[in-house]
Structure formats: structure tokens, C-alpha cells
Amino acid sequence: MGKFTHIMIHCTDTPEGREVSKEDLIKWHIKERGWSRLGYAGIWHLDGDFEVLTPFDEDGEIESWEITNGARGWNGWTRHFVYSGGGNNVDTRTVYQLANMRSTLIQELHYNPDVKIIGHNQVSSKYCPSFDVSQWCETIGIPKENIDYGKYY
């Protein structure tokens, strides 16, 4: 719980074309791993639709009810978003996901202009989200001051 400083991008680590539902994530995170809550605040589906998984507001703070278990050590100040796909370290984002990912991030930065965007693979030795978030953010016009280029592991 604290000031909202980061948006972290994740992948579901599933094959290209496989949709992932909220129910799938509940099964994987809560039932199988025993987590107390989901790992993500929202998911971009294959058709580009963004589904809120854990409700959040735009007040610049991560409240206890907004916390998700996306990356150990980062959850108290980070909003975690995931896209369906990314299995085997392959960027499988659809054109629809790409378009709405950009729109979602621009909207989040409108409400929280000091937030930085980062990939899960920048805070853990994983390949998730299967693409270079910093580089992609540059190509879609995210201001450099909103891109976290660091490696934290």
C-alpha cells in the first residue's frame, strides 16, 4: 500500500491463439498456487478487450483492496496488467491487443502522469512478458519519463 509508481506488463505464458479467462487465472493463482488474490488487475484478451480483474481507482495510491500478486516486492505500489499469450518466450500479441494496450497505458498515464511502465522480466529472471517493454513503449510514443529502463534482479 502506497503511492502508485509503476504499471508492470505480464503475459499469461500460453500458446498463441489461446484465450485466458478470469476463471482460468483464479484457478491458477488462487486454487493451484494458494495465493490470497489474483496476480493481475486487468487482462487484455485476444480480441483486444480489456477486462478489469481486480477493481482499482485512479487516485494515485494503491490501496489494500487494489493489491495484486504480480511480482514479489513490487505489489504495494504497482498495478499489474497481463495479456493472453506470450508462451515459450514468443510475443504473440494480436493487433487488437497491441492497439488496446497502448490505449490503456495512455489512459492510465493521463490519470497518473508520474507512473512508469516496466516489464515483469525487468524485476525477475523470467521471460514474461515475452517482449521488451521499454523498447515497445518508445515505439508507441510513451514519454521516456514514463518508461522504466532498469533491471532490478
Predicted regions and their residues:
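Basic/polar, cationic surfaces and motifs that engage anionic cell-wall
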Residues: 1-12, 16, 46-57, 61, ...
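Short, charged beta->alpha transition segments
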Residues: 63-72
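Cell wall/extracellular polymer interaction/catalysis modules
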Residues: 1-37, 43-46, 68
